[in-house]
Structures are given as C-alpha cells and as structure tokens.
Amino acid sequence: QPADRGQPMTRHPATLEVVRNALYATAEEMSVIVMRSARSPLLKEAGDLSSALTDAEGRLIAQGRDIPIHLGVMGFTVKEFLKRVPKDRLREGDVWFLNLPEVGGNHLPDVKALRPVFVGGRLVAFAINLAHWADIGGAVPGSYVPWATECYQEGLRIAPIRLFSAEGPDRHAIDFVLANLRGRDEREGDLFAQFAADDVAARRLQELFAHYGADTVLACFERLHAESEMQMRAALRALPDGAWE
C-alpha cells in the first residue's frame, strides 16, 4: 500500500478525473504553444521539446505526450533547481532558464524554462518545458562537438538564471545569453515561446485552484502520486523471481 502522506484525499472520483485531465491538458497545451510560437524548425517542425507540471517539491504530476528522455528528468530538474534557488527567492511571474547537465541531465542544447506557480501567495506547483535550441554556442555551429575534451567546448552553460519576472523580460540577462549563441533572432523567438508556454500553464493552474480550492487540488496531487505508487508496486509484484537490472 502507498505510504500515508498525511494529506486528505478528494472525496469524489469525478473531481479527481476532472483535475487529472485538466493537468494533462495543460501539459499538452504547453507543448503546442512552443511549437506554434517558436522560430526554429527544430521546434516548429521536428517537435524536439517536452512539457510537464510538478508539485511544489518537484514531484511530477502531469506530462505531455512528448519525448521520454526529456520527461524523465523534469522532476529531477525542479528538485536540483530548488537546491540552488531557495523557495524564498521565488516570486510570482518568475521564469528561470537553465541547461546544466547536473541540474536536469541531457545535453547543453536542451534548455529548460521553469516557472513557479503561486496561489494566494503560496507556492503550489511548477510549470517546466524543455526545448532543444538549434545552437547553444561552443566550438561548432549546432553545438555538437564530438571531439570535445571538456564541457566548456560544447556551448554556453546556463546556471539557473531568471530571465522574466512580473515586471517583464530582463533584457540585460536575455541579451547576455543571446550574445553567446549563433542565430540570435531564432533563439530569441524560441526563448519567448518557452516563456509563453509557462505563462499559460501558470494561468491554467491558477484557474483550476480558483475553481476547486487549494485543498481539493492538492489532495488530487497526492492521490495521483498514491495511484502511481500502487501501479508500480503491482508491476513489481508481477515480475517473476530472478535477478533484475
């Protein structure tokens, strides 16, 4: 049985299903926004991007039908981000960008945009999307450097940096990032597309909380995690005896 996390469960199964599907729809919408708004064919045509939602601790609660190697690091990214940027530094309207492999895996061109979501001044979730930028600087165009002997040859390493706040874009910080990349105009369009996806996701979550109340939505988060745990335990029990790697 899943561990008792001390959280109330939603009383009505229909409410859980509505919330569940609202979360899934929000993650799907994020990916559509990036594809329709970005300038790079790598995003608009190839769809090399992914989107997800986590709770305030970085536990995955919903994801788009995107790329598994991206989706597998979303929760880890938020948890590692919070080790570097404490919650008391986060504000409504912030969107942080990062690409460090040690803060979410993947390679440098996979740039993540992360937005904390607040309801009534309380941090309740994160919206996060990942987009493969067609160039992240480095020794060669496209930023694939097979002969690299160190990570610095592969491109710009973006530690968590806030590029947007409630006041709008931080042009100085954005210009610093773009000055280190090839194809500045295209990269800028991709960057703003990622911001737009997080912005819409935050509004969708706030609407969901306003409609059902924080206690109910957060209880649904807990129920989703409990269901995932039960399903994983059932899958493990179904494995035949033996050694597994």
Where are these regions (language model features)?
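Gly/Pro-rich active-site capping loops and adjacent beta-alpha segments
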Residues: 123-180
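A short, hydrophobic, proline-anchored segment that marks a local hinge/packing element in signaling
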Residues: 110-120, 128
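Short, basic/aromatic recognition patches
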Residues: 22-46, 82, 86, 97-104
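Gly/Pro-rich turn-and-neighbor structural signature
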Residues: 41, 48-98, 209-245
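N-terminal leader/propeptide and maturation segments of large enzyme subunits in energy/redox metabolism
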Residues: 10-15, 157-232
